[in-house]
Amino acid sequence: MSWQTYVDEHLMCDIDGQGQQLAASAIVGHDGSVWAQSSSFPQFKPQEITGIMKDFEEPGHLAPTGLHLGGIKYMVIQGEAGAVIRGKKGSGGITIKKTGQALVFGIYEEPVTPGQCNMVVERLGDYLIDQGL
């Protein structure tokens, strides 16, 4: 299965059969290389991925400045140290799950809820971890 298939079928899927989906998603290597992304995923700067990776290594690193992706600032909210970073911006937000080799991104807007985004992103991330990726 190609990385793009994971994005198209597992991240940009119909959530709970409700006809809702994430606004954008991607799978990005720890080095910032894009493995696959939705057409709506923002163009990001390498230093933004560096900052995200640093927060996984040193939880709380992004809290004072916020999480930036594609020039958009998200307020960092409770995640799981070293495993999941969550951010909020207005009625939307972002979930990032770290696997052994990749970062799985999900960006949502209402009516998708934070919990739905977390479920979609973390489910794929956990699967990739189980596969040794």
UniProtKB/Swiss-Prot annotation:
Name this protein carries in UniProt: Profilin-2
Other facts noted in the record for this chain: The variability of the residues taking part of IgE-binding epitopes might be responsible of the difference in cross-reactivity among olive pollen cultivars, and between distantly related pollen species, leading to a variable range of allergy reactions among atopic patients.
GO annotations of cellular component type: cell cortex; cytoskeleton
Record-linked PROSITE patterns: PROFILIN (PS00414)
SS bond partners: 13-117
Species of the source: Betula pendula
Gene3D superfamilies: Dynein light chain 2a, cytoplasmic (3.30.450.30)
Keyword annotations from UniProtKB, A to Z: Actin-binding, Allergen, Cytoplasm, Cytoskeleton, Disulfide bond, Phosphoprotein
Example of a GO MF term: actin monomer binding
Signal peptide (UniProt feature, chain positions): none
Major localization listed first in the record, in broad terms: cytoplasm
CDD domains per record: PROF (cd00148)
Post-translational modification comment from the UniProt entry: Phosphorylated by MAP kinases.
Phosphothreonine, modified sites: 113
Pfam family, one: Profilin
